[in-house]
């Protein structure tokens, strides 16, 4: 059965935040907002910290739909994630391909899970010497609908 881009977008396009996680572990997780929406032919996202209200990342994306996966392309960086259905068939798992590097030569590792109520994201950036530049947190950010 082909993967459903309509269901993927239905699950993804919401206003999300990690308020509960930030309240439970304030020394580990900042309170972050992460919004996704479709405008015209493009998928957009923006992120900001609750304390400042200033957007620190805004991106435009496009999807390439295949029979068994969705390729989420990040237009600004040229990087992408491959989403497949999870084992339950009621959600999605997205990962950067192995050996993904950004324009600065930093190895990027991202794992995202998505279902009708939860979006989790774990990102790690590693330099050529194996030093972790980001992603030292104890687990993924866990976002819920706002």
Region annotations inferred by a language model:
Residues 2-46, 51-52:
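Short N-terminal edge-element motif at the start of the domain
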Residues 5, 15, 19-25, 51-146:
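Calycin-type beta-barrel ligand-binding domains and close structural analogs
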């Amino acid at each position: 059965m082909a993967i459903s881009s309509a269901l993927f977008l239905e699950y993804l396009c919401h206003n999300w935040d990690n308020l509960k996680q930030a309240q439970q572990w304030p020394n580990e997780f900042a309170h972050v907002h992460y919004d996704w929406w479709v405008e015209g032919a493009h998928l957009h996202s923006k992120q900001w910290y609750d304390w400042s209200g200033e957007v620190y990342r805004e991106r435009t994306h496009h999807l390439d739909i295949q029979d068994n996966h969705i390729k989420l392309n990040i237009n600004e960086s040229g990087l992408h994630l491959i989403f497949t259905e999870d084992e339950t068939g009621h959600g999605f798992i997205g990962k950067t391909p192995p050996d993904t590097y950004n324009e600065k030569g930093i190895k990027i590792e991202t794992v995202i899970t998505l279902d009708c109520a939860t979006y989790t994201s774990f990102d790690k950036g590693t330099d050529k010497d194996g030093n972790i530049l980001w992603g030292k947190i104890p687990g993924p950010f866990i976002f819920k609908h706002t």
